[in-house]
Amino acid sequence: FEIETQPAMAEKAAAPAFSEESIRDAAAMINAAKRPVLYLGGGVINAPARVRELAEKAQLPTTMTLMALGMLPKAHPLSLGMLGMHGVRSTNYILQEADLLIVLGARFDDRAIGKTEQFCPNAKIIHVDIDRAELGKIKQPHVAIQADVDDVLAQLIPLVEAQPRAEWHQLVADLQREFPCPIPKACDPLSHYGLINAVAACVDDNAIITTDVGQHQMWTAQAYPLNRPRQWLTSGGLGTMGFGLPAAIGAALANPDRKVLCFSGDGSLMMNIQEMATASENQLDVKIILMNNEALGLVHQQQSLFYKQGVFAATYPGKINFMQIAAGFGLETCDLNNEADPQAALQEIINRPGPALIHVRIDAEEKVYPMVPPGAANTEMVGE
């Protein structure tokens, strides 16, 4: 049948209006604060320049949720890294000392804040979010602004005073020394963290990083040097296993001049493994880095830690030959466990154009640490 007319294009809804008074109130709170923290969520994605300008002008230590990683470079002196369940240990303690939270585009989810009533108990809250339903849903803000983050910052930044906040930065540094977050086996490309570091050494910041969902996702969030907005594509909220490879394909189609690296686990990869055919048919420069622990790692970890070793339906009794599967789809393959020089082999296959599977075996007993147990406060972390 024939369609005579195309449906009308969707129109972008007008950004919500907000009051000048709320901006003045927010600025006054920031200027008066002694221990403020900037708390970024995925809703800041379209405001990277102004977010950084605010942080640097007011010298705000800045923490990010999983969805906001890269908004400040990993090594930026104001970056506290990720907060929450698998966040930076010192960051969870630093937040408890805050007297003001400036929350931009974040929703106070339980993975980020842990036990609600014990999260930042002494901090006033400024909350900016375009979704009215998020304002006051979990934590009651002292100033709530429903608006686009970039629009708010355009008016807020001129009213914010430049301050050194030397005492606060000294306390932050002291807590970071007291509660370090070590990265074990950081130089071993056959270990979880070492593999992530080795992959990062093969590319520059133009590379796009996608992940599936599981332990590999958390390890990558902790260790990969994410240094720019939109470098990082991952599934928060619903935590969709199988997200990584299709996301990598989309990123490669939209950015044919960039390397695209997809970190995945064996459980997640099998959710959408047929999309290897799409990557192969289009000869997309997508490299799948498969951390294969023959288990559903996060499920295995939760059961091992909190259910008296009662691991159930979390391991694969039969071995799956991902190398043969990938080759059958037409991908290049590399098993780093069989390479005399894993780093050199990794560099070589990443440098080659086209899709490839890079396979590394990971011990199923490896854990993502630190970890905030379910229902606990962020300061009740377990693990190394």
Explain the meaning of each model-derived region.
Residues F1-A13, P73-A75, A173-I183, R230-Q231, ...:
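Gly-rich Lys/Arg/Thr-decorated short loops/hinges at beta-loop-alpha junctions or inter-strand turns
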Residues S22-P36, L54, L95-A98, A198-A207, ...:
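Glycine-rich phosphate/diphosphate-binding loops that line cofactor/substrate pockets in enzymes
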Residues A173-A252, P370:
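Active-site diphosphate/adenylate-binding microenvironment
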Residues L60-M67, I126-D129, I288-M291:
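Short internal beta-strands
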Residues L38, S90-L101, G105-D109, M218-L296:
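Thiamine diphosphate
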Residues A68-L171:
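Glycine-rich, acidic loop regions that bind phosphate or pyrophosphate groups
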